Amino acid sequence: MVYRTPIAWMFALSAMGCKKVDEAPKEYESALAYMFEHFDDEDPERLVETVEFLDEWLVGADLEAAEEGLSIQNLPQSAVGGLAGHAHKTDGLEGVSLATSSRYPTCMLMEALTQYSFARMMPDVYITYDREFDSGQDCIATRDCLWAEGSVYSVADWGVLGEVTADRRIEYRWIETAEGWAFLQRWWLTEESTGTRLGLSIGDQYYIGINFPDGDGTRRIHGSWLTMEMVTGDASTGASKQLIKNWKKDAEDLDAWISANL
């Protein structure tokens, strides 16, 4: 982890906010918002259709753009109104998305993400990662069940921004597509996340992950919307751009961990 002085860190967030990130096409950002809002639909047909659309869309120049990172428009309030936790809002959210790839199949990614602690997989980031499943942990990796959900309490090391605590609800779901089994991830903050320095607070954050077969490996799509404040004011734009950098590193770290441990 790279440590910066507070002034340098605030400048970096400001610079990231100024750096242009291409806007996602409407059909792409609408697909991500749909997947988040309808994640728990009983009938998976439209979810499957949306995954297959994204699979077909992510080729050529569109794939290259998504692998660099795209800005996405806000979630509708209807997507968050029924979520557990505090009174969720979508006002002022900044959204970004990134496409990454893994050389491992979806079943191995699901195993890593649900059966092992992120504090073990990413020890340079997580000081604490306490996860408790309400259902599905013992069967989701083998697809003996198609749904798992639970809660996470984490403390992350953000360098000069201090230790950042977060409480999340997490959900995982398998769906079967024409190309094979895909899995979806959804999480959101159940209360404001806070840091120990520079007045950092994340009022709301929502995440959608879409993972589907790509040859012998997996194509992964990440999308997130958040609001963040610091002593300098609204830091949402800079924070959302930092997510792109983080996701790229996390994807590499996850593959490296799987290679060494599974």
Where are these regions (language model features)?
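Eukaryotic helix-grip
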Residues: 21-262
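Bacterial N-terminal signal peptides that target proteins for export
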Residues: 1-7
